Every structure is written in structure tokens, then in C-alpha cells.
Amino acid sequence: LIEEYIETVGEFGETRTTKETRAHFYEGIMYFCWAPFANYCAHHYAEYESAELDKDLPFLFLHGDNDSGKGMFLRFGARLISNGYVQEVTTGGDFVKDNIERAQASDTVFPYIVDDVAKSKIDRDIIKSYWEGKWDGSIQMPTFIFSSNDSTKPKSELRTRMKTLDFNVNFSELEEDEREAAAQIAGQADSCNLFPWFAHLF
């Protein structure tokens, strides 16, 4: 399923960097599988005096133009690690301070996934110091997965706290049957049972 989904980059998309973009899609899927274990890793890193959790536990930032498949990718990842229970993600308009603070107190390991968030909402101190001073191991805190259409990336001090993947592909010229085929491939995430297998190995 993973290979079939990543192949949509070359099969249905327009890109001059097919190999690199496929690699970024794959890295993104690996991040989704890792995301529920961020707190597990935090416990490990916190044992060291040199730990900087906000750098040791980077968020995932998907950067690309409109129609680069970021939204479908986020939904695919959410469905993949929830066996289809989570089908939609948060929109950028809901990414506000109150909701970020609720996430810090939510006691959940499922990532906070935000589609099409403005760069100005990411360039904030609450993101810069999300883990430090908030995480003490008593409750679980979700990591963040963002996508943005903004032409510029977050400022440099934020980029050290994020894994940035560029989706240099365009799916805007898809025919209806191609869109249906791509959606059908993504829909298989609901029942593939990949994440329980991955979690067991982890």
C-alpha cells in the first residue's frame, strides 16, 4: 500500500523531482508512524542533561504549492495510524493558542494534524517552546504535523524544531478517473493494519 501510494507522485502528478518527492512522501509516512511514540522518546531524551526536547522532538512541516497533495497526504497518514477511525484533520483556522494549550493537556499520543496553516501561526513562541517547561512525563502530549501553502518557510529558529518536507508536485491536471484511482489507493489505509504491526515491532 505504501509503495502504491507513493507511486501516485509519478503516475498522477507533474514534477521534475520525482525521486526526491517520493522520498519526502515516504519520510512523511515514517514520521506518522513515529508520532505516537514522541512521548516515549521524550522520556529517553530527558535522562540527559543536554536534552533540548523542542529540538530533539521535531514537528513535521509539509511545504508545497496548492494541489501538491498535502491535504490528501495528511488524511492518508491519519487514517493509516488510526485504522480509519480518524478521517479528517484540523484546518489552519483552528490552530490557535487555546487549542494548542488544550493539546498540551490532552493526554493523548495521537498527533495534532493541521492542514493549510498560515506561516504566521507557526512563527510563535508557543510552538518554539512547546515541549520545554510543559512536558514532565505525567501526561502525554501530541506532536504536531503541519502543512502550508505559504511561499516562505518558518523563520530559522523554528526550522530547527521541525522536519521540513517539500512536496514539489502538482496534481491539478488529474482526470476524474485518476482522482478516483488516487482516492481509492488512499482509502486502503483504513484496513491495511500497518500501524499495529509497526507499533508491535517498536
Question: What is each model feature region?
Answer:
Residues 83-88, 144, 162-164:
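Conserved beta-strand scaffold positions in the cores of enzyme catalytic domains, especially
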